[in-house]
Amino acid sequence: MKKWLVVFFLSASALANPQQELNQRLGMNDGFSANFNQTVTSPEGEVVMEGEGSVDIARPSLFRWSTSLPDENLLVSDGKTLWYYSPFIEQVSIYWQEQAVQQTPFVLLTRNQSSDWENYQITQDGNVFTLVPKAADSTQGQFQIDIDAKGIVHGFNVIEQDGQKGIFKFTDMKLGKPAAARFTFNIPEGVEVDDQRN
């Protein structure tokens, strides 16, 4: 009986299409915290930038992305509003999170909504899922998510239309929903505010 169940579940898993499989894997964990390393390469493969920082994600739609190198930047979403803070230029820009979804597929990792995935052609190669926008007039390139069968995201790649590639690798992964306070942002005194919500 046990062998039959194992075969059944393996067969059912094999029948899932890449979109369903990605959706299922992302739904396995409700959040995580990690450090990340970032490498940006030119279309010719030369390293043009390296960076590092930390990330907190809680589903649905909460995230905190903090870059410490090469420049300090902070991106925080409470599920509705997105704040982008750059201490160097002493400015915070404010957006609706819906605006961010249209600009960066990274936000898709935090939402995992079927309606979002329908905008992409999704293919799977092992644990790497590649998303290509379906819209012919899209300015987005490809987005690749490295997520294992236990739902642990190991990293992602952003491949621009010109061939430039951003590679993000997660380390020191801690599964579980981070504290709610990680997803709030208080505007520091004296900084310029650029409110893009319309």
From Swiss-Prot:
Compartments, as annotated in UniProt: Periplasm
GO biological process: lipoprotein localization to outer membrane; lipoprotein transport
InterPro entries: LolA/LolB/LppX, OM_lipoprot_carrier_LolA-like, OM_lipoprot_carrier_LolA_Pbac
Keyword vocabulary terms for this entry: Chaperone, Periplasm, Protein transport, Signal, Transport
Position of the signal peptide: 1-16
Cellular component terms (Gene Ontology): outer membrane-bounded periplasmic space
Keyword Transport listed: yes
Alphabetical list of CDD domains matching this protein: LolA
Sequence similarity: Belongs to the LolA family.
Quaternary structure and interacting proteins, as annotated: Monomer.
The protein's name in its UniProt record: Outer-membrane lipoprotein carrier protein
Protein species of origin: Vibrio vulnificus (strain YJ016)
